């Protein structure tokens, strides 16, 4: 598919800000920080390369995008790499395909994702994980302000990641992930028709994660409580033109409780909380930093990380509004058939994404397949509205079982 865009819009895209405009932000007075009704202006948090936050896992995608503390599989590196050290299998891999903007009739934008891990160590479990994320924005025809054709391009972004995780005790594991990020949105194009060219963005980042796992005896068997936490995408800012934008630094905390119902049936309840660790735009902050940018945008990544818990112009109440909630449930029959459902909530002032998710999982011999479907519940349109996505998984235990048979 060929998309013709006004060059000004492409320039805006090259800034790669993950911004959603809410009704309260319209008509905001920068001198008072109030909207026409006297309410504090909602500040949608802005980051570059938002593709890093796209959930690539169809299993998690069917459970409202929870993933920090659910039982580990090959896609754990996206949520919480420390879970690899607690995986029951020594080896696993996955392939995921996520179509993008299908509800708008776009058919050449997609996210492809591959991940895998290998567990080693007899007395102390350790694991190495790897992943590759590729986001294609399709084919674009560049035009200038006068709609004159300048050529064609294929914007794309990718991320490679390597993780190491280690079990510190029977109940606790930690992990770290190193990443390289590349973003080519409009490389070589000039936003003003002059000599200034848009460059490709490059960045390095790290994740740190931990998982606590505790068995709890019940009448029907032993249940498993998992609690996890992860700080993700801590790295340098990414630059396309003169200014630099923050990576989507994020703090996530999650819990999941897997409960056996009988010999063949089990159910898991999970909850995740996520908050971006970057500055909240403040229309009342007119200070200019050393690089000529607004002071809130001119902070270092580390300063932004620690300051993000108290920089919202609306105070503590607005900080709480920046927390996204995900809740999900997963039912398994005989560890071969799964039914999943979930809900995702984001405050209206911070984007307004709200949706239900449903999905199925099937496992047979060496292969498992997960499907998920997203049903929006708010007026805020999303790129995954009414979209079916799927993941394929392979694990070492399945290979061993097949050989034994």
Language-model features: locations:
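Bacterial Sec-dependent N-terminal signal peptides
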Residues: 1-27, 275
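Subset of outer-membrane beta-barrel
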Residues: 24-405
